[in-house]
Amino acid sequence: MSDDRRLAVLRAIVEDYVSSHEPVGSKALVERHQLGVSPATIRNDMAVLEEEGYITQPHTSAGRIPTDKGYRLFVDRLANVKPMSPAEKRAIQTFLEGADDVDDIVDRTVRLLAQITRQAAVVQYPSLSRAAVRHVELVPVGGRSALLVLITDSGRVEQRVLDVRSAADPESLAAALAALRTRVNARVVGKRLRDAREDLTDLVQQTPPGDLAVAAEVAVALGDCLTAGLEERVVIAGTANLVKSGADLSTSLGSVLEALEEHVVLLRLVQELTEDSDRGGLTVRIGAENLHLGLDGTSVVTSGYGTGPDTVLARLGVLGPTRMDYPTTMAAVRAVSRYVSRILAQ
């Protein structure tokens, strides 16, 4: 659609419908917006927009509401994403900078997104398919127990408490762990998790006979940590926000909540959005563009985050009704993703 005036009319309809929850008529458009034309001209423009599938008339109402196609054109033609205020940016930064580790960052992020957008928020844990081992720590913690800590270059931490039954006594366990720690780090630091896991067999075979049993137990636990690190995970918050706006969903609320409970569905959706995006930028899917059962009446706004512009580790975003304040929501998702990326890069 090349007519700038009709695009302005569509933009006004979207903005008014999102703010008022009511179908929008030509008279209201003339009163609220400086469109510079008569109500009759507005009615003609609305007729064309309806004929082309950008707006529709719900039931017997005299007003019109946007269709998925109308929302899509509105989003695609946004001149710029509405910036957040300095106060909002400071609040986001302060809240996220208090995080202790990746788990805390993800937890704070998903709660923050749900709060500021009033939608359901989804955060994918940093993908470790390309992550490397930063450090492995082995610490005796009393008796024949030991703490194994795996730290990746993305900040992810996996840990296990081991009951090392093969150790003769606490002193010999401490000595074996110290020697193992040096050999393990020399072997796996800097390697991808999958590659590091494959090296564990050689590591055990090259261990001196006196420490062989301890090394075997440590290798099993470290292998579990490396495997756990490769699992894809998502967290969700703010489903209560969907309950509050259930009347705005064109599909049943139950279907949406059911889909959100299936993390496999969410992971598949996130993967598709990653493929759609350009280097982790903002991606918006509207209504029927979401092909997954139960989500075709919602809109999803996501952005990638990572440790740098070329290192996108995962995605975060929100899901809500198609009647969404897209400029504000897109600004919030973009701002949060940037702050999370800065924290991970530190």
Curated annotation (Swiss-Prot):
Signal peptide from the UniProt entry: none
Keywords assigned by UniProt, alphabetized: Repressor, Stress response, Transcription, Transcription regulation
Keyword Transcription regulation attributed: yes
Biological process annotations from GO: negative regulation of DNA-templated transcription
Listed Pfam families: HrcA, HTH_DeoR
Recorded superkingdom: Bacteria
Coiled coil: none
Entry keyword annotation includes Transcription regulation: yes
Gene Ontology MF: a single term: DNA binding
InterPro entries noted in UniProt: DeoR_HTH (IPR001034), GAF-like_dom_sf (IPR029016), HrcA (IPR002571), HrcA_C (IPR021153), WH-like_DNA-bd_sf (IPR036388), WH_DNA-bd_sf (IPR036390), WHTH_transcript_rep_HrcA_IDD (IPR023120)
Role played: Negative regulator of class I heat shock genes (grpE-dnaK-dnaJ and groELS operons). Prevents heat-shock induction of these operons.
Family affiliation: Belongs to the HrcA family.
PANTHER family noted in UniProt: HEAT-INDUCIBLE TRANSCRIPTION REPRESSOR HRCA
HAMAP family: HrcA (MF_00081)
Protein name: Heat-inducible transcription repressor HrcA
Native species: Kineococcus radiotolerans (strain ATCC BAA-149 / DSM 14245 / SRS30216)
Taxonomic lineage: Bacteria, Bacillati, Actinomycetota, Actinomycetes, Kineosporiales
Gene: hrcA
